[in-house]
């Protein structure tokens, strides 16, 4: 009997030793539920929308309207919970076991010295420890901004200037490069480059987030090219959107306003913007969000009448004082196209004239041209949609897919202006991120829709309805001489202004005028033609009217990754990364051509409708970043 007890005791001891590790493993991997309430330390009122995350992981949730939260995850004790909310100090709380319900009190924070930024070093860090100058606008700053939209609030950031080319097209600039198209200022949304591949610049916030989905904006007004490439040599901005895990529910806003009050040239008009957002998370593992917005308004019309080519310039007619001011026959209007004397086009030189009794006199005369307000459409809109799906693979890893699409109208300015009409930009992004790594791939697609170039439109309106420059010049000279014959046979300072006005009227006979059905019909025809040349003996493949269409279709493929090796390196923090990018340009036979085809055939479509082989541009890059803190983090050495 005693032997039996000994055997049973030995067997029990062995089983307990085998079960103990399994029990420990089960404890380490058991599903732990932590719940509690978050309140304001001073008022003791519940705080809704407080972010609750597990430190060192991607797991998290937010408090409800009563300040309550519940978080389930497979954890090992002890662990830390991080509580954060706009306007309150971030607080960490250690959870040692499954005890009572947590009661957390957050203290208000008036000075945002402990804000965390990501853009400066590609890793989270205190804004005061950032190695470069960086500005951050969080939700509280954006809400309190007097700007009409969060995107306009960028103009209030130190070192940033905003250039407004159109109601839907606003361009942030830094370092004094205040130009309509800042190619070296990178604009990111959650790390994605928003540029349109063929235009080379982002189209404002055409497919960016709405105010309902923006979490913060980080702006680096100085060079950031070491970590982000040459496109960031003038600086960069990163628009960071809300996580569907942390910001759930349904949101909606409607804005309305009136612009051009008290202005001239047109009546006041309405401005409207509508947006809706919905986000939902399931079991802290899966979450999604959708955003939809629509903006519509009437753009400002450029209508400056300043003469860029006054009569005292050599490109005008300085020898004839009678042709000064309103009588300038070489007038080059600021917001007029088709009269571009200073550009060396749209002008004729009339020689062999006798003026004031002097033979062999020459007049420089500009074509009449068209005002910009008659060539562009001031009614603009911006419709955009985005959706995202997030899945937490583990405590430290999250996989997400984002899709964005936007349609916009507006005016884009380079050497001259481009009317953007039904431009569509799309973006697909797939991202895998962990506590110390990130892999991201995205694709952008651009389609310029029904856009057109304003200058060739004006040129071809004149050329198609008023004749070539030489033919128009001949009619002008003939009318000038006829006027002289009918008025004593002489051209003098006294009648030169009236004579040139009569000659222009005769030369413009048959020219289509704005506001007429003939003008609208010819304008529509020219906009639909993707060849800016008019048919002639030297350009036999062009159309009779010429064209102004801007047909640009392109794709951008990008992949990047980064790895934080700080835990593997003992003496300093090390971050490595790299990227690769491919631009795919589809030839249109006008703006972009297939150079492998004969010159005469590059503007002619092939049997399949294409204009040749697609054009590819490739880029690869890599970076290394080392940081070391010394003297109890009072000194930070940084190199990249």
Residue ranges and their predicted role:
Residues 429-640:
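Face-selective signature of the C-terminal outer-membrane beta-barrel domain
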Residues 58-68:
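Short, acidic Ser/Thr/Gly-rich low-complexity loop/linker segments typical of extracellular
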Residues 183-185, 246-250, 284-288, 395-399, ...:
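Outer-envelope beta-barrel architecture signal
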Residues 70-72, 192-223, 276:
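Short acidic/polar hinge/loop motifs at secondary-structure boundaries
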Residues 212-215, 221, 226-310, 381-383:
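Outer-membrane beta-barrel translocator/receptor signature
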Residues 72, 134, 151-196, 215-216:
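Extracytoplasmic beta-strand/coil segments of soluble accessory domains associated
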């Amino acid at each position: 009997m005693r032997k039996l007890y000994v055997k049973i005791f030995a067997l029990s001891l062995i089983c307990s030793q085998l079960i103990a590790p399994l029990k420990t493993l089960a404890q380490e991997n058991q599903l732990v539920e932590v719940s509690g309430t978050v309140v304001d330390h001073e008022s003791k009122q519940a705080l809704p929308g407080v972010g609750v995350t597990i430190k060192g992981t991607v797991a998290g949730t937010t408090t409800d309207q009563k300040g309550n939260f519940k978080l389930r995850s497979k954890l090992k004790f002890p662990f830390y919970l991080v509580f954060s909310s706009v306007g309150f100090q971030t607080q960490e709380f250690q959870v040692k076991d499954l005890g009572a319900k947590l009661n957390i009190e957050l203290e208000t924070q008036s000075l945002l010295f402990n804000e965390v930024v990501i853009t400066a070093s590609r890793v989270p860090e205190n804004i005061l420890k950032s190695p470069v100058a960086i500005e951050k606008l969080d939700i509280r700053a954006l809400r309190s901004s007097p700007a009409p939209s969060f995107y306009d609030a960028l103009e209030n950031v130190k070192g940033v200037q905003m250039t407004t080319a159109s109601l839907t097209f606003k361009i942030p600039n830094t370092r004094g490069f205040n130009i309509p198209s800042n190619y070296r200022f990178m604009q990111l949304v959650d790390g994605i480059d928003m540029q349109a591949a063929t235009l080379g610049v982002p189209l404002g916030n055409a497919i960016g987030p709405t105010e309902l989905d923006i979490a913060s904006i980080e702006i680096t007004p100085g060079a950031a090219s070491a970590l982000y490439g040459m496109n960031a040599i003038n600086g960069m901005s990163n628009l960071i959107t809300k996580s569907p895990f942390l910001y759930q529910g349904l949101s909606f806003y409607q804005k309305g306003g009136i612009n051009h009050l008290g202005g001239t040239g047109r009546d006041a008009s309405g401005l409207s913007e509508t947006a809706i957002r919905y986000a939902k998370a399931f079991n802290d593992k899966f979450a999604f969000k959708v955003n939809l917005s629509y903006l519509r308004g009437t753009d400002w019309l450029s209508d400056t009448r300043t003469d860029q080519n006054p009569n005292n310039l050599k490109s005008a007619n300085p020898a004839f004082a009678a042709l000064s001011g309103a009588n300038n026959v070489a007038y080059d209007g600021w917001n007029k196209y088709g009269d571009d004397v200073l550009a060396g086009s749209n002008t004729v030189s009339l020689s062999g004239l006798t003026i004031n009794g002097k033979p062999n006199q020459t007049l420089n005369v500009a074509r009449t041209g068209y005002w910009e307000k008659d060539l562009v459409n001031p009614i603009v809109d911006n419709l955009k949609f985005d959706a995202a799906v997030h899945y937490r693979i583990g405590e430290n890893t999250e996989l997400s897919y984002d899709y964005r699409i936007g349609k916009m109208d507006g005016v884009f300015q380079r050497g001259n202006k481009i009317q953007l009409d039904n431009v569509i930009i799309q973006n697909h992004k797939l991202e895998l991120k962990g506590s110390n790594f990130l892999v991201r791939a995205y694709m952008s697609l651009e389609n310029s829709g029904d856009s057109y170039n304003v200058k060739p439109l004006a040129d071809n309106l004149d050329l198609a309805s008023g004749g070539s420059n030489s033919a128009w010049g001949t009619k002008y000279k003939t009318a000038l001489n006829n006027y002289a014959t009918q008025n004593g046979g002489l051209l003098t300072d006294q009648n030169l202004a009236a004579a040139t006005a009569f000659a222009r009227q005769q030369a413009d006979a048959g020219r289509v005028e704005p506001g007429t059905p003939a003008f609208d019909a010819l304008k529509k025809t020219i906009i639909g033609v993707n060849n800016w040349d008019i048919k002639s003996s030297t350009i036999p493949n062009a159309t009779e009217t010429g064209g102004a269409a801007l047909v640009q279709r392109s794709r951008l493929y990008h992949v990047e990754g980064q790895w934080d090796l700080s835990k593997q390196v003992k003496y300093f923090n090390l971050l490595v990364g790299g990227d690769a990018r491919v631009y795919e340009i589809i030839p249109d036979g006008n703006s972009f051509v297939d150079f492998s085809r004969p010159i005469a055939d590059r503007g002619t479509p092939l049997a399949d409708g294409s204009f040749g082989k697609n054009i590819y541009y490739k880029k690869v890059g890599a970076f290394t970043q080392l940081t070391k803190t010394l003297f109890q983090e009072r000194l930070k050495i940084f190199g990249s």
